[in-house]
Regions:
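Conserved HGGG/HGGXW glycine-rich cap/lid loop of the alpha/beta-hydrolase fold
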Residues: 34, 40-85
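Generic low-polarity alpha-helical segments
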Residues: 1, 12, 38, 52, ...
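Alpha/beta-hydrolase fold catalytic core
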Residues: 2-46, 69-71, 112
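Flexible "cap/lid" subdomain of the alpha/beta-hydrolase fold that forms the substrate-access gate
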Residues: 18-23, 46, 74, 81-117, ...
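Residue-level signal for well-ordered alpha-helical scaffold segments within enzymatic catalytic domains
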Residues: 4, 39, 62-69, 104-108, ...
Length: 199
């Protein structure tokens, strides 16, 4: 099952979804007063998909469509993104709170555990979820982010990784962050139809 699931996730890069927005159900979970939006489709074992930067739930549309005949696919909008609440203050984005948001979504669906899938920044949240809450982690799939120890090691000792990760440090500078507009970030999306959803 794990190999099949991973293969489907990796291979579902073509646009299968069509108008997935008419097929998914939208809902909110309450994470200690912060509303976390999620979209869900299908039935079966629960998969929770956590997007990276600068995406939102819609980035998982193809995977949701491909897996929905065998799984309940749930893609969240992390706090600060799209339809989820955007609390002010950096302290409201601590990874422990982001993990708590995933817990809130799982609990709002009446479940005790899930297959956790994360990409990029969502991969960091997925790793922390699995490390902190193994009893709630049925399986873990992380795309584009190594184990936290490996990442820490590479950031400390590998000049190539330091260079490749510099963009994240740049985002912390006020003058750079102020230039990150929805229109500019949407240019990263290659599919013109999908690009419109990011603005």
């Amino acid at each position: 099952m794990v190999r099949t699931l991973l293969l489907l996730i990796l291979l579902s890069t073509t646009t299968l979804a069509g108008d997935i927005e008419s097929k998914v159900k939208h809902a909110y979970a309450n994470s200690n007063g912060v509303k976390i939006h999620y979209a869900t489709i299908g039935s079966g074992p629960l998969i929770v998909m956590i997007h990276g930067f600068p995406d939102f739930w819609y980035t998982w549309r193809d995977q949701m469509e491909a897996l929905s005949d065998k799984f309940q696919c749930v893609a969240i909008d992390q706090r600060g993104y799209n339809l989820s609440d955007k609390p002010k203050g950096v302290e409201n984005y601590d990874v422990r709170l982001l993990v708590g948001d995933v817990v809130a979504v799982i609990k709002s669906l009446g479940q005790e555990k899930a297959i956790i899938v994360g990409h990029d920044w969502g991969g960091l949240v997925a790793w922390q979820f699995a490390l902190n809450l193994p009893q709630m982690t049925d399986r873990l799939i992380v795309l584009n982010l190594p184990h936290p120890r490996g990442l820490t090691r590479e950031l400390a000792h590998n000049p190539d990784q330091q260079k490749n990760s510099q963009y994240a440090r740049n985002f912390q500078q006020a003058e750079v962050a102020s230039k990150l507009t929805p229109e500019g970030l949407a240019r990263w999306v290659k599919d013109p139809a999908a690009r419109e959803k990011y603005i």
